[in-house]
């Protein structure tokens, strides 16, 4: 019986040495929201708490300025 190998999660922002997450960096922010528009929790992404707070604030600012959608495209 094979054991399940879980990959270790790491914080991408710590590894890259990011000081501040910018709300205008849409490509980065899109990778942290689901296709329905929800913010992905840090227990799934592995983001540290400090950067998760910055990330959620940046996503909310980008949504307010219509850079990111609140929800997916309704058909």
UniProtKB/Swiss-Prot annotation:
Keywords: Ribonucleoprotein, Ribosomal protein, RNA-binding, rRNA-binding
Cellular compartments per GO CC: cytosolic small ribosomal subunit
Pfam families: Ribosomal_S18
GO BP term, example: translation
Any one GO molecular function term: structural constituent of ribosome
InterPro entries: Ribosomal_bS18, Ribosomal_bS18_CS, Ribosomal_bS18_sf
HAMAP family xrefs: Ribosomal_bS18
Stated family: Belongs to the bacterial ribosomal protein bS18 family.
Functional summary from the UniProt entry: Binds as a heterodimer with protein bS6 to the central domain of the 16S rRNA, where it helps stabilize the platform of the 30S subunit.
Self-association and partners: Part of the 30S ribosomal subunit. Forms a tight heterodimer with protein bS6.
Protein name: Small ribosomal subunit protein bS18
Organism of provenance: Chromohalobacter salexigens (strain ATCC BAA-138 / DSM 3043 / CIP 106854 / NCIMB 13768 / 1H11)
